Amino acid sequence: MRFQPPEDIFPSVKDWLELGAESKRKGIYKSIYPHFYLKKRVKNPPVRYPIKLAEGYAAIIPGGRVWGDNGAIVTPENKLIWDVSLEWVKNKWDHSIFKMETLPPVTHHYDAIADLTHVGSRNYYHWMFEVLPRLHLIRESGFTVNRYILKYAPKHSPFQSETMTHLGISRDDIQKTHRQFHIQAENLIVPSQPTFVTKWAYDFLRNSFLTENKLNPSINKRIYISRRETRRILNENDLIEFLTGYGFIKVELEWMSVAEQVQLFSGAEAIVAPHGAGLTNLTFCPPKTKILEIFPSTYITGLYWLISALGNLDYYYFIGASEQVPNAQQWHGYDNLTIDMKKFSSFFKNIGIK
């Protein structure tokens, strides 16, 4: 059976339950974690206060459908649910599902299937904070699950298989999405899809990967994280020479397992790094760890400042001169940068690392 693209959009699962058709009566919505307001902990943060962190919930959509590689959620009335179908588009109507003339034939599943898809699943930050915590919400809900739907590419992103195995999910439990993917479940279980750092996700990651592992802290206490691809520091050799004088060592996280990264960060006392997904591991740092994040002038975000605030870390940031990468499609998140070492040296000496 083929479907036309959705006829309309519900902003959220809760809106579908309140405004949808008769099928809503069979839907179930469980709020697991309420909204959380973050208290101010650092001076001059890179984002504005107050910070309202999203609610965590899990819901059952009887007869719900999942379409495409990114896992768009469609109701039995053929309407897209936006808050669990996010794509990086400016307008909701630019979602890829609306560019289809017809959708692929649907496969019916007469059991309970849980959706864990996310457009950014191949990125370490998005996987750790916006995919894995959804599994936690499902478990907290008490809903029975037969299989999980994932945007899953462990050969490209080995952290996916390592973390899923650690959390007790085997390859046989996973159904991978693809461009022609289109299923309808007897009971589609849909947890909320975080779009930013949340306290409950932070706590879940620490409880799952730090406490349970009982890791021995790394002997490397002062760490500089180097990037091999985008957002590189073009005069990095000058920076490394400076930091070496303060006992820092250079690491490349791309070559490390998740367990090794957790161990490294759990024993750190100071970390310097250009902005990048590896700083997701600040989640595992002990309180008061000094963090110095380096941004290009064209791309500044409060993502890792927020993780630092949740962990009571001593966070600072420094802004370098940006240089746009060719063919970056005008998105400045890929920009490389150059550091004015005279300014950096003065700034560094004022943050208390001796």
Model feature map: region roles:
Residues 1-354:
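The feature primarily captures lumenal catalytic ectodomains
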